[in-house]
Protein backbone atom coordinates (compact mmCIF):
# COMPACT_ATOMS: atom_id res chain seq x y z
CA UNK A 1 0.00 0.00 0.00
CA UNK A 2 1.21 3.43 -0.91
CA UNK A 3 0.33 6.60 0.98
CA UNK A 4 -1.64 9.13 -1.05
CA UNK A 5 -1.69 12.89 -0.56
CA UNK A 6 -4.32 15.31 -1.81
CA UNK A 7 -4.17 19.09 -1.83
CA UNK A 8 -7.55 20.71 -2.47
CA UNK A 9 -7.50 24.46 -3.07
CA UNK A 10 -10.55 26.61 -2.40
CA UNK A 11 -11.05 30.28 -3.20
CA UNK A 12 -13.89 31.60 -1.05
CA UNK A 13 -15.96 34.69 -1.75
CA UNK A 14 -14.86 37.71 0.30
CA UNK A 15 -16.77 37.87 3.58
CA UNK A 16 -17.59 34.13 3.51
CA UNK A 17 -14.37 32.92 5.15
CA UNK A 18 -15.78 32.18 8.62
CA UNK A 19 -18.86 30.49 7.17
CA UNK A 20 -16.61 28.28 5.04
CA UNK A 21 -14.52 27.33 8.09
CA UNK A 22 -17.62 26.46 10.12
CA UNK A 23 -19.05 24.36 7.27
CA UNK A 24 -15.71 22.54 6.99
CA UNK A 25 -15.59 21.51 10.66
CA UNK A 26 -17.95 18.48 10.37
CA UNK A 27 -16.02 17.38 7.27
CA UNK A 28 -12.70 17.62 9.09
CA UNK A 29 -13.91 15.70 12.14
CA UNK A 30 -15.66 13.03 10.06
CA UNK A 31 -12.66 12.53 7.79
CA UNK A 32 -10.21 12.25 10.68
CA UNK A 33 -12.38 9.39 12.02
CA UNK A 34 -12.14 7.42 8.76
CA UNK A 35 -10.07 4.26 9.06
CA UNK A 36 -7.87 5.05 6.05
CA UNK A 37 -7.20 8.70 6.89
CA UNK A 38 -3.72 9.61 8.14
CA UNK A 39 -4.21 13.38 8.42
CA UNK A 40 -6.70 16.00 7.29
CA UNK A 41 -6.10 19.71 7.86
CA UNK A 42 -7.53 22.98 6.61
CA UNK A 43 -5.21 25.97 6.20
CA UNK A 44 -6.06 29.59 5.46
CA UNK A 45 -3.53 31.79 3.69
CA UNK A 46 -2.69 34.65 6.10
CA UNK A 47 -1.79 37.04 3.27
CA UNK A 48 -4.88 36.12 1.20
CA UNK A 49 -7.66 35.17 3.65
CA UNK A 50 -10.05 33.98 0.94
CA UNK A 51 -7.57 31.24 -0.09
CA UNK A 52 -7.73 27.88 1.68
CA UNK A 53 -6.19 24.46 1.22
CA UNK A 54 -7.16 21.08 2.56
CA UNK A 55 -4.02 18.98 3.05
CA UNK A 56 -5.07 15.33 3.15
CA UNK A 57 -3.13 12.09 3.62
CA UNK A 58 -4.60 8.62 3.18
CA UNK A 59 -3.13 5.15 3.50
CA UNK A 60 -4.13 4.16 -0.06
CA UNK A 61 -6.37 4.91 -3.04
CA UNK A 62 -9.22 2.88 -1.57
CA UNK A 63 -9.28 5.18 1.48
CA UNK A 64 -9.72 8.16 -0.86
CA UNK A 65 -12.64 6.41 -2.56
CA UNK A 66 -14.28 5.70 0.80
CA UNK A 67 -13.81 9.36 1.76
CA UNK A 68 -15.33 10.64 -1.50
CA UNK A 69 -18.44 8.53 -0.91
CA UNK A 70 -18.83 9.47 2.77
CA UNK A 71 -21.90 11.31 4.03
CA UNK A 72 -19.81 14.11 5.55
CA UNK A 73 -17.99 14.71 2.25
CA UNK A 74 -21.25 14.80 0.29
CA UNK A 75 -22.86 17.11 2.87
CA UNK A 76 -19.90 19.51 2.71
CA UNK A 77 -20.22 19.80 -1.06
CA UNK A 78 -23.83 20.89 -0.67
CA UNK A 79 -23.11 23.14 2.35
CA UNK A 80 -20.54 25.27 0.52
CA UNK A 81 -22.68 25.98 -2.54
CA UNK A 82 -22.61 29.74 -2.98
CA UNK A 83 -19.49 30.24 -0.85
CA UNK A 84 -16.80 29.62 -3.47
CA UNK A 85 -15.42 32.17 -5.93
CA UNK A 86 -14.36 29.31 -8.24
CA UNK A 87 -14.38 25.52 -8.37
CA UNK A 88 -12.15 23.54 -6.04
CA UNK A 89 -8.79 22.61 -7.55
CA UNK A 90 -7.73 19.13 -6.46
CA UNK A 91 -4.22 17.73 -6.89
CA UNK A 92 -3.10 14.19 -6.01
CA UNK A 93 0.43 13.15 -5.12
Across the structure, where does each feature detected by a protein language model lie?
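An amphipathic, aromatic/His-enriched active-site/gating alpha helix that lines ligand/cofactor pockets
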Residues: 26-38, 57-91
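Short, structured helix-loop boundary elements
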Residues: 17, 21, 51, 70-73, ...
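Glycine-rich beta-strand-turn "strand-cap" elements at beta-sheet edges
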Residues: 2-5, 42-50, 78-93
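Short, well-ordered beta-strand segments in beta-rich or mixed alpha/beta enzyme
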Residues: 4-11, 41-68
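N-terminal first-folded block
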Residues: 4-26, 30
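Short, flexible segments with low predicted structural confidence
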Residues: 2-4, 18-19, 35-37, 52
Amino acid sequence: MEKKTIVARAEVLPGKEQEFISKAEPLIQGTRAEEGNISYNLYQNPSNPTAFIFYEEYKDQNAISVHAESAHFQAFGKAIEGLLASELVIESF
